[in-house]
Design a protein with these regions (language model features):
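N-terminal subdomain of nucleotide-sugar transferases
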Residues: 2-77, 261
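A short helix/loop element that forms part of the nucleotide-sugar donor recognition site in Leloir-type
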Residues: 65-70, 221-235
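Membrane-proximal helix-turn-helix segments that form the acceptor-binding/catalytic region
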Residues: 130, 137-141, 168-187
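Helix-loop-beta element that forms the nucleotide-linked donor phosphate-binding surface
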Residues: 188-189, 195-216
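Conserved donor-binding/catalytic core segment of Leloir-type glycosyltransferases
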Residues: 236-252, 258-261, 272
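Nucleotide-sugar-dependent
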Residues: 252, 302-309, 316-337, 342-355
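Nucleotide-activated donor-binding/catalytic signature segment of Leloir-type glycosyltransferases, i.e.
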Residues: 268, 272-275, 281-307
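A short, well-ordered alpha-helix in the C-terminal region of glycosyltransferases
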Residues: 378, 385-399
Length: 415
């Protein structure tokens, strides 16, 4: 592995702040936390930070691209822990092997970098579980600042979704979290609901928590529909194309969408799922077995193709399961809003995402398959409402969730 960027020493460093970031995923991997980490890290270089990232070999999907052990990517020094043939997330055994391999390799690699040069800040996200502990231990050992960014709150998310986790393990995980929160100078969360969970449920001091939401990934302009793409997807004139894109995992009640599609058989609507996750295979088998013709699936798409599909859709679906409203936040909503697409949220109306949509009049919220089917039938009768909500989504995005605005908040926090 090329370590040249880590062996230059500190000569001529001046007042540059040196940041060590640790996360299992990073660009070009398709995992959303890795993509956001890459945006943050490359954005911070324009504010005078020298950024070094310890990450894993791309592995989120079995189709993840190859990447070198070391590269300078958009001004960021990226060091990768090799994963061999451990790729994908469809079964827990593969996930666990990836977690262990990354944590072990990241610990060794981060310690080597910290011995080679002086860092000012360690920053970790939440992939994999316990990477925050790794960051906290290193920060204590080398007496430097530590910032923690949990995009999901674990193990609460897993417990809430019915995972059978031994009580002792949940207790140990809680002890680890308390240590991480104690060592962290700042904890960055995505929403007010997540902050309330940490303050009231985890006893994290409110003054330690910062709220910085997400932005569109990719961040788009409002663009006209691509008729060729609609033809390729076999969407007929007058049909609605409803898009679900992202993780098809345990956090998402996707059966509601499938059930609504089943009730809308023969109507002028198509549902397209793009992405991967633990539920994907099950959903595809259900659609096939029940002969639900207007539902189709695609794997993660290259960015350019995904953008073409997104701008050609009529509305986008965003989900989060009951009980998870204050533990996680589906990030795709911001990409959809940046493209000027109306949003249909399927979740508790008090979830942070549902509140964003309701308060800014850029979509609708439903909780059941009956409600979703009824809404779609109404939209088929009134397509003008789709365009109006889409324009409002774009306006809201520009006012509240632009990437440059939010990266600046990270720069101010870390200085």
């Amino acid at each position: 592995m090329d370590r040249r960027a880590g062996e230059k020493g500190d000569k001529g460093r001046g007042t540059v702040r040196r940041l060590l970031v640790i996360n299992q995923y990073y660009a070009p991997d398709v995992a959303s936390t890795g993509q956001y980490a890459a945006d943050i890290c490359s954005g911070l270089t324009s504010y005078g930070f020298e950024v070094h990232v310890v990450t894993g070999e791309p592995s989120y999907s079995i189709n993840s691209p190859d990447a070198p052990d070391f590269e300078i990517l958009n001004g960021v020094n990226v060091y990768r822990v090799p994963f061999g043939n451990v790729k994908g997330r469809e079964d827990n055994k593969t996930r666990f092997k990836g977690y262990v391999r990354f944590l072990r390799g990241a610990w060794r690699l981060a310690r080597k970098l910290l011995r080679l040069r002086k860092f000012d800040i360690i920053l970790t996200f939440h992939n994999p579980p316990f990477v925050g502990l790794l960051g906290a231990l290193l920060a204590k050992k080398y007496k430097i600042r530590f910032v923690y960014i949990p995009y999901d709150i674990h193990p609460d998310v897993l417990v809430a979704t019915g995972w059978r986790i031994p009580k002792l393990f949940v207790w140990v995980w809680g002890v680890v979290n308390r240590m991480v929160f104690k060592v962290a100078e700042k904890v960055v969360v995505l929403s007010e609901g997540m902050k309330n969970t940490l303050v009231h449920g985890k006893k994290v001091p409110a003054e330690k928590i910062e709220i910085i939401p997400l932005w569109g990934k990719p961040e788009l302009d409002a663009t006209s529909s691509d008729n060729l793409i609609r033809e390729e997807l076999e969407v007929k004139d007058g049909e609605l194309l409803l898009l679900y894109a992202g993780n098809m995992g345990i956090l998402h009640p996707l059966d509601i969408i499938i059930e609504a599609a089943k009730r809308l058989q023969g109507k002028s609507v198509k549902f397209l799922f793009i992405g991967d996750g633990a539920k994907r295979r099950y959903l595809m088998e259900r659609v096939k077995n029940e002969n639900i013709e207007q539902v189709s699936f695609l794997p993660f798409q290259p960015v350019g193709k995904f953008v073409q599909i997104l701008v050609s859709s009529d509305a986008c679906l965003v989900t989060i399961d009951k009980g998870l409203e204050n533990l996680a936040l589906p990030s795709r909503i911001f990409t959809f809003m940046s493209a000027g697409k109306p949003i249909i949220t399927i979740m508790n109306p008090e979830a942070d995402v549902a509140k964003i949509i309701r308060e800014n009049n850029c979509g609708w919220n439903v909780q059941t398959s009956d409600e979703l089917a009824e809404l779609i039938l109404n939209l088929l009768k009134d397509p003008i409402e789709l365009k109006q909500k889409g324009k409002q989504a774009r306006k809201t995005y520009l006012n509240q969730f632009r990437r440059d605005k939010l990266i600046k908040q990270y720069a101010q926090l870390l200085k």
